[in-house]
Every structure is written in structure tokens, then in C-alpha cells.
């Protein structure tokens, strides 16, 4: 049985580094000022950001996007100076790039990462560069921060995950359970990722979502895809999510997740019919609609999917960092929430997310799990009993093995187009 340990007990080879011990970290951004609600009254975009319940603190920062060409970065997280080491970098078709990295302790922050380096999802960052802008998710000691453009500036947002919207509408439990052809031949005690697969996703953002975000929406979408792929790598899923296309729509949102998702999915109802032409042209297996509805984080068309139902809607502010983008695609692959939240055993008794809630200390949860009783960070991992975080298995074979579900169904979805 393959067993991997991550976090403080981890030892993983970090790729893409050739950093001398004497190297200097490049400053990614410098603080300008913490923005108060009173000072944001004259700027609607800032006012909306500060009014978002999950926004704890907003700080204007001065960004040097060119710093992401370097293997080490340093910056200040609301008064605390930190340094990060690059694990890999990816080039984007539009000329941009994605920088993946890990935070290091002060004792090794200026040394090259080796096989003894830590690989901790609670101390990691992913940054998308587009021209002079940076859009990224930063987790330090489990706490989520977002770096993003807003108008002609950049802001660092400290996020209070306990105040994020509910994951789904109340009628989530009435979603159809859609049988899928699967490949459930990996044993319960095994951790095989099976044959690699690629799922292509078409992302459509409403104009309302683009306006409300006020940043570079395409970069946010690229960040969502990058985070999803990192989660698949972290959990040994053997799956790559590929951005087939991104476009916007002038569709006027109804204010109801179920209605908007139905209209997105419909091929001849007169609302967003053209996206199905785009789907075919781009050979997208899955479609995701980004909307400006803060009532919930997202909604999938079912637990499991067919080629005609592989659609989901996501509130833009939950898509990254909180991993709702990957979460909803997980539902389309038949993944369910943690067993305490969702006791259904269909289609897989083991197909649930996982929460770790110790009597004392900090807990955590995987991508498909609802929040802990005392609130806990959502880590970019799928439940998997064969992977441990700080010595704690991230699932169990009987009720919490989302990795196995994704491996079962990935080939089916990858063949939708």
C-alpha cells in the first residue's frame, strides 16, 4: 500500500529549484496601507470587498509582478515578513505564468529545497501572473489570504473562512444521483491513480460576476484550474484539468442558483444557448458558470453526471482558495460531502470528504468536507486514507476516500467531448 505523509512529517522532492544557499528572495509586494470601511466609501469596488462577510482585513499593496520570475519570494503578511520557495512554474498560452511555492521556516528560508523539505498545504501559495498583475491564493499557518488586482491597484485580503457562504442551497440533498460508468478495480487498501486522464473545462462568467470581482477574471479562472490540478497532484488522482475556454455572458442572473444552473445547462431555452456551441468547438467535457450570488458557494447538476448534465455554477468569491471550483466538479464525478454532513452511501459508500476535529488544537478538512464545528481550514486535498497530514490519515477506506471516486470516474468524464 502506498502511503504518503505531508506537513511537518513530510519529505517530498520539490521540483524546479536550483537555488544557491546565498540567494536572495525577490520582494513580491510591499504594504501601502490597511483600508478602512470609512476610507472606502468613495470607491464602490473597495466598499463591496470590505462589505463581504468573509473579508477580515484589506490592505493595499505595491506589487512587482516581475518578481515571479525568481525562485524565491518575500513579502509581508499584515506585519509578518515571510519567504517562499518555488516548487514549479508553468507557462500560460496567453504569455502569463503560474508560480507554485511553499513557505519555509526562518532557518532554511534562503536555502534550496531538498528531499527533506516540507510540503505543507497549510503553508503554500499559487500565483498567476498576467502582465503587471498578480492573482493568487496564499495559505500561511492554515490561514487564507488572497492577492488580487482591484482597479488600478493590488490588495491583500485576509479571509475569515468561518464566514464564507454555505456550500450549497438547502435543496442540495434532492440533487439527482446520476449513475456513471466507472473503473472501480483499485482495491480498498490500494492508492493507485490508475491511467492518467485529462478533463477539459469551459468557464463562462456573467457580466455581473466580472463587475463584482473588479479584477482580472481570466486570471482568477486560471488560478481555479491551477488549484484544482494541485489538489489532484497532492492526492494522487492522476487527473489534469485543462482550461478549454473562457468567455463572458450578458445573461442577467435570476438570483437563484438552481434557475441559473438550469439555464446554463439548457441547450434551447433562449438564455445561454451559445455556450453549447463553444463547448463543442473547444471540446470541453465540463462547463462551469461563475455568478455573482453570495447566498451559496456553488451547485452541481447532480452527484455524478452525463455529457448533457456535466455543468455547475459557482459564486466567484468561493472559486479559489476555498476550492469550490474543484468541489463542484468533484460532485459531477460522484464525490460527496463528509459523512457527518451527508450520510448517503450512493453511489459509493466510501465516497465522502473528511474532517479532522481534535478535542484540542486545530482541525482541518478536505475539499468535499463541510466546516468543522469550531471552524477549520479547507486544505487542497481530496480525502484519501493513504495520505497523512502531520501523521493523521486524511480519510478512511470505508467512508472517506474521494481519491478513489475520482479515479473511478475520471475516464468517463474525460470522454464527454
UniProtKB/Swiss-Prot annotation:
Belongs to the peptidase M72 family. It catalyses: Cleavage of Xaa-|-Asp, Xaa-|-Glu and Xaa-|-cysteic acid bonds. The active site is at 328. It comes from Stenotrophomonas maltophilia (strain K279a). Keywords: Hydrolase, Metal-binding, Metalloprotease, Protease, Signal, Zinc. Metalloprotease, specifically cleaves on the N-terminal side of aspartyl, glutamyl and cysteic acid residues. Coiled coil: none annotated. This is Peptidyl-Asp metalloendopeptidase. GO terms for biological process: proteolysis. It is an enzyme of class 3 (hydrolase). Its EC number is 3.4.24.33. Disulfide bonds: none annotated.
Amino acid at each position: 500500500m502506498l502511503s504518503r505523509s505531508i506537513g511537518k512529517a513530510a519529505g517530498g522532492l520539490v521540483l524546479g529549484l536550483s537555488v544557491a544557499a546565498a540567494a536572495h528572495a525577490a520582494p513580491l509586494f510591499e504594504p501601502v496601507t490597511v483600508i478602512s470601511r470609512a476610507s472606502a466609501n468613495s470607491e464602490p469596488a473597495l466598499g463591496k470587498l470590505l462589505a463581504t462577510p468573509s473579508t477580515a482585513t484589506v490592505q493595499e499593496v505595491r506589487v512587482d509582478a516581475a518578481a515571479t520570475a525568481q525562485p524565491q519570494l518575500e513579502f509581508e503578511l499584515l506585519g509578518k515578513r515571510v519567504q517562499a520557495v518555488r516548487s514549479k512554474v508553468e507557462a500560460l498560452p496567453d504569455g502569463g505564468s503560474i508560480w507554485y511555492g511553499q513557505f519555509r521556516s526562518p532557518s532554511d528560508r534562503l536555502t534550496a529545497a531538498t528531499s527533506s523539505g516540507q510540503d505543507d498545504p497549510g503553508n503554500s501559495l499559487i500565483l498567476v501572473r498576467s502582465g503587471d498583475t498578480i492573482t493568487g491564493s496564499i495559505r500561511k499557518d492554515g490561514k487564507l489570504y488572497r492577492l488580487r488586482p482591484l482597479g488600478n491597484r493590488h490588495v491583500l485580503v485576509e479571509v475569515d473562512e468561518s464566514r464564507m457562504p454555505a456550500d450549497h442551497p438547502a435543496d442540495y440533498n434532492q440533487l439527482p444521483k446520476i449513475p456513471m460508468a466507472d473503473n472501480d478495480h483499485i482495491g480498498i487498501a490500494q492508492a493507485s491513480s490508475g491511467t492518467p486522464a485529462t478533463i477539459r473545462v469551459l468557464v463562462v462568467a456573467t457580466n455581473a460576476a466580472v463587475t463584482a470581482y473588479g479584477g482580472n477574471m481570466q486570471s482568477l479562472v486560471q488560478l481555479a484550474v491551477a488549484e484544482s490540478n494541485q489538489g489532484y497532484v497532492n492526492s494522487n488522482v492522476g487527473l489534469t484539468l485543462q482550461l478549454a475556454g473562457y468567455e463572458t455572458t450578458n445573461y442577467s442572473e435570476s438570483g437563484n442558483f438552481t434557475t441559473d444552473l438550469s439555464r446554463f445547462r439548457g441547450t434551447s431555452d433562449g438564455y445561454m444557448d451559445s455556450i453549447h456551441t463553444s463547448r463543442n468547438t473547444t471540446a470541453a467535457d465540463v462547463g462551469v458558470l461563475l455568478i455573482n450570488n453570495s447566498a451559496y458557494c456553488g451547485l452541481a447538476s447532480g452527484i455524478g453526471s452525463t455529457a448533457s448534465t456535466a455543468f455547475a455554477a459557482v459564486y466567484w468569491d468561493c472559486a479559489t482558495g476555498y476550492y469550490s471550483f474543484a468541489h463542484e466538479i468533484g460532485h459531477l464525478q460522484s464525490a460527496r460531502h463528509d459523512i457527518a454532513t451527508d450520510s448517503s452511501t450512493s453511489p459509493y459508500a466510501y465516497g465522502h470528504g473528511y474532517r479532522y476535529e481534535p478535542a484540542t488544537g486545530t482541525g482541518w478538512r478536505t475539499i468535499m468536507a463541510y466546516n468543522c464545528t469550531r471552524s477549520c481550514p479547507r486544505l487542497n486535498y481530496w480525502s484519501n486514507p493513504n495520505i497523512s497530514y502531520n501523521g493523521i490519515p486524511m480519510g478512511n477506506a470505508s467512508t472517506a476516500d474521494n481519491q478513489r471516486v475520482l479515479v473511478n470516474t475520471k475516464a468517463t468524464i474525460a470522454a464527454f467531448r
